[in-house]
A protein has these predicted regions:
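Extracytosolic low-complexity repeat regions of secreted or lipid-anchored proteins
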Residues: 77-134
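Tryptophan-paired
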Residues: 48-100
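Short coil/turn motif common to extracellular beta-sandwich-like domains
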Residues: 29-38
Length: 135
C-alpha cells in the first residue's frame, strides 16, 4: 500500500513538473521580417531614382519592369529619403546607385552599414542609422 501511494505521489509530482518544462516554451512562430535602411540623398543634386545591390543581387533598376521576379530587395521613396528594404539579411556593405530623371547613373558607391540586431530569442528586424550620402 505504501509503495502504491509513493508511486502515485511520484507520478503526480512528475506530471505537475512536466508543465514547467514544456518543449514548446521557447518555440518561435514561423514568421519572417524585413530589414531596412534609409538613405538620405538630399546633398546629391538631381537624384530621381535609387538602386542598391547586395553582392550580386540588386533591387530593380529604374525604368525596368517591376513585376515580381522573386527579389526581396526593393526601394521606396519616402519623405525623409529612400528606404532600402532587404530580406532578413543585414549585410555589412551595399552598393548604392543614384540615377537622374533620364535614368542615367550619376553616382555609385559602396556604403557600410552598422546594424543594431534584435536580442529577442526568436530574432527580429535589425535597425540601422540613416545613411547620409555626400556629393
Amino acid at each position: 500500500m505504501r509503495r502504491t501511494a509513493a508511486v502515485i505521489l511520484t507520478g503526480l509530482l512528475l506530471l505537475g513538473l512536466a508543465g514547467c518544462a514544456s518543449p514548446f516554451q521557447n518555440a518561435c512562430p514561423a514568421i519572417g521580417w524585413l530589414n531596412a535602411v534609409t538613405v538620405d540623398t538630399s546633398a546629391v543634386p538631381g537624384v530621381s531614382a535609387v538602386q542598391f545591390c547586395v553582392e550580386s543581387e540588386c533591387s530593380p533598376a529604374p525604368g525596368s519592369e517591376t513585376d515580381d521576379d522573386g527579389s526581396l530587395l526593393w526601394v521606396n521613396a519616402e519623405e525623409d529619403g529612400w528606404v532600402l528594404s532587404l530580406d532578413m539579411s543585414a549585410p555589412e556593405a551595399i552598393t548604392i546607385r543614384l540615377f537622374d530623371a533620364n535614368n542615367l547613373l550619376i553616382r555609385e558607391s559602396e556604403e557600410s552599414i552598422s546594424w543594431t540586431h534584435s536580442d529577442d530569442p526568436c530574432g527580429g528586424p535589425s535597425t540601422a542609422e540613416t545613411l547620409i550620402l555626400k556629393p
